[in-house]
Structures are given as structure tokens and as C-alpha cells.
């Protein structure tokens, strides 16, 4: 019930790499004081298994029901699909809300707090998300004092608190703060991170009667999504990933043919993605095209977000746009507190936001953004959905969203990554338009695409 084959082990084994230290099976069960402890997500299967054997289980419910919250006056109105989600989820004590970015998972979760009416702890994995939750709760529940644990601060109130899961783990002995057992309702934002060992440890100590997970991408690249469902429960409400009715969705695919250095095109060995990224960062012509396209977008009234996977690349793009007279803000990892505060202060007025994907890939909320420049290639559909979600926020006057994708056709590894993105774009309802790049070099490898009915060739 609580064990599964580890996909990472078998993938590593298939590649003939060493599997030392990689478990063949992963178990989320444990023996505790003579009892077999199963994750809450296994409850339905355990009951079904017992009933198949004509065994009627007896229940001794020791869950924490929490302190009642009687005076909650919400300053918002849920949309119909959000009300439907709340109505469905409240039929269950635990489970996951699976909805795409821009559905409004945060406000729906606040609606669940109002519905449950018990003290609540919201668990996040980053300080950025903690701050965003603080802002939303102060807006939608202004009469409630919000506590927080994380980012160097520890000020829980016991009514509605927000915490980074890392701040609940004692680094010396890996023990979990007993505080987590005092809440009747736990909300786990971006719950696909639950497979992280320490995050799972935190949730194992939760006694709350109600547990709600929020995610846009429950599938994980490592195949460990079963841990998520065991820890938080099954998906109780899923919003279909249908083509967005509010926006016209287009991907501009720029096919580039710059010849990579010899070491990347050796036929006897596959290049490392880190080496390919290094070449892309140092490719002046490619970076100049991205900067030029972003500049043109601003001149045409667009609000672009430029995403890359390397901090030095973000700085380079930021510097070039600034030199062209474009107001630009850069967001990246390892920023000092003063730098982050300065960036946040200029975020609303900046014409272009340049960022690393890991910094703004989840939870980043700037509704006016309508154009995404994918300056570095990625492959995983979950990451692409998160990135695309940054431009799907509702904003007055926004009717169209556009993604600019730069495909380096001369390198097979980058072509293969694009084929995965291409499939994901179509699944998200985007129309694809193909453009030849600005290189005067002849293509060494042509992009193998078969335009579909919603694809235009330029």
C-alpha cells in the first residue's frame, strides 16, 4: 500500500550506471510503538483491502480538530469554478486541488479556510511564497492577524500561520517542532515538493484533521509523485488543462542555426547539457536577438518576462536592455536582502522583467505580463507549464499571451528538448508559428516539425 518501485533506480540501471545508494523500492510506511503507520493517503486503499477480507475496521480518531475560527469576514467572492472546487473538496478531510496556474488556487484555499473555520497552518517551500501568502491573506482576510515562521523570523499566532517547512525542522537532530501538531487544518502550497525527504518528515508529524495540497503539476520528473499522494491524499478536484478561453495563445518559434563549437558536436559522445548552456550563454548573436525581440515587444506595448536558467545570462540580458533605455528589473537566486527589496520596489514600474526560472517559476504573481521569452531551453512539461503560467494571470485589457521559443537546430540534444516542448505547447492549446532565425549560416540540421492544423509556417 505504501511502497512503490523507484523509477530513478531502474532508469539508472538501464543506463548501466552505478545504482549504489539508490533504493530499488521506496516505502512511506514505518513501524512506530508496535503499530504499522501508513500515510493518510493510503486510508481508502487500506479500508478497501480489509473489506475485501470481510474485516470491519474500528476507528480511534486521534486527529487534531483545531481551534475554531468564528469571526472570519472574507473580502472576496469566489468564481463559480472556485466555488465548485471548495464544495467538492469539503466532502473529504484530505486531498489535493490540481488546477493550472491562474485558476486562483490561493484564493480558493483561503475559501477553504473560511469554510473549515479552524486554525490553519500554510506550508510553503520558499520565503518568496511565504511573503506572497502574507500579502494575499492581508488583502482577503484583513481582520485576521497573520503569523509566520521562516525567513529568520518566528512569530506564530496560532490562528492562521504561514511557515516554510525548512524552518520547522531542527537542523541538529532533524526533529520537528511540536507546534505543527496544534493546527486543525494544514494547507501545503506547491505540494509537488512533498517528495523532498524533510518536507515529507514534516507532514508525517501533522495531526490535523484537514489537509489540503495545492499544485498545478502533480507529476514529477523523477517519478516520485506517489509520495505526494500518500502524504496529502488523492486528487479531489482537477481543473482540466483546456485551451484558455480568455486569451489568444501563440508560440513564436525562432529556428536558429549558429554552429556550436567542435566539442559539442562530436559524434562519439553526447554533450552535457551544462556545456550546451554555457555555449548559449556565450553566444553573442543569439543573446542579441533575444534582447532585440524583447525591445520590439516593449515598443509594441507588450509586457515581457525573459526567463533563463543561468544568472550570468540574466545579468547580460538585463545590462543590454538597460543600455537601450529600457527599464528592467532582474530577479535571480543568491540576491542579498537589499537587492531583493530594491527589485521588488521597481517590479511594478519595470518595462521588462528578467529572471531565472527557479526564482519565478512558482508562485510569482505579476498579472500584467503577457509575453514570455524562453531564453534557455527546457524539456520537462511540468516546468514549461509553470513558466507559461506566469503570463496567464488575469489582467484588465489582456487578451493575448505569447511565448517566444528559441530553438538551436544545430545541436541534436537541444532539438530533442524542443520536441518535448512542442508537444507540451499543443497540449496547453497554443498555436505554433515557425520563423527562420537571423543567422546567415546554412542549417546543419533542419528542425523536424510537422505543422498541425493550428500551426503556421512563416
Across the structure, where does each feature detected by a protein language model lie?
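Post-DEXD/H (motif II) to motif III coupling segment of the RecA-like Helicase ATP-binding lobe
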Residues: 184-185, 192-253, 425
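Conserved pre-motif I regulatory segment
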Residues: 27-31, 49-52, 57-98
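Conserved interdomain hinge at the start of the Helicase C-terminal
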Residues: 268-309, 315-320
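Conserved helix/coil segment N-terminal to the catalytic DExD/H
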Residues: 151-185, 196-201, 359
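Conserved RecA-like P-loop NTPase helicase motor core
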Residues: 332-427, 431
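Conserved helicase ATPase core of P-loop NTP-dependent helicases/translocases
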Residues: 131, 146-149, 154-156, 305, ...
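Conserved nucleic-acid-binding Ia/Ib motif block in the N-terminal RecA-like helicase ATPase lobe
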Residues: 118-170, 328
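Walker A/P-loop
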Residues: 91-113
